[in-house]
């Protein structure tokens, strides 16, 4: 159990939060109350379902409503990403295309396409390369806003996780009614052309699901300010691939009305792997005994590569890996074991005797390869 888990257990016990939510509906808690145990910024950042403290169980979630107040309740706050290349929850008539080739003009000398590590860097390259123009069918999108800002005032309804949940007075037709008043929101990138404002939420790590609030709060802010349509886009950059997913809110007053409109994959490299490439890889591969590694339980190879990319920046403890990927700490070992099986990472003790997962020479060599080289290797 992590420190965050421990602190939330103390808060739940002190304020009898679970019982109050069950009997009376949403429970409001202040930043000052949370700060008695740990910094609120660290205690309220749960970007995936799996990152929620265990005391929240499978139905409770937390949302900010002002600069200093949060609400805890039986809220359905997360949405699953579709399987990459799969149908997911697409609007009828749309499809997932293959990986499109993009390019950066050769006069940009400051950009190394083989060393795009940060979310901000990936968003910059996405704009410069014309990826966003192609994906949204726009013309010359330019970045106009980014960073933290106040949400303004708005109300919305959010659905409960469980069907048949007890309905207090604040329960509406579609869910609980929540009022937001100048909560802090953050936009990774806002791009505008003549007809559209595209709002980008960027990640450089692969997750299975995401917190809808990351798109919904900024969407409500800008949808209330602008005459032109606001198009929320989630961008994930990993393994040299830009994955863009456009969403829409079919009812702007309903948090859970989110729908996936379309998905696109882009790369600055050649990603086509031929049968000849595969045959050559097979012919030069020597058969070796399997290493003595426990049974591999990792279920996403994309996350394995994403972990190696993060280890290239610095060694990570299992707890830090769990924080980066937004899952339980035990799952850190699932993905470490997959990396270890492939010879990409090992566990070592640092000077303070803390166990850290460290990238191997083979892992660093892998990341120096282009997309095709990584997949074939």
Labelled PLM ranges:
Residues 115, 249-252, 265:
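Extended, well-ordered protein cores
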Residues 1-116, 120-121:
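Nuclease-adjacent, charged terminal/linker segments that flank catalytic cores
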Residues 196-198, 203-211, 222-252:
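Nucleic-acid nuclease catalytic cores
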Residues 139-190:
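Active-site metal-binding core of divalent-cation-utilizing nuclease and nuclease-like domains
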Residues 105-158:
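Low-complexity, highly charged intrinsically disordered N-terminal segments
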Residues 132, 137-143, 181-197, 297-312:
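A short mid-domain helix/strand-loop element embedded in enzyme catalytic domains
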Residues 257-377:
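Donor-sugar nucleotide-binding helix/loop cap in glycosyltransferases
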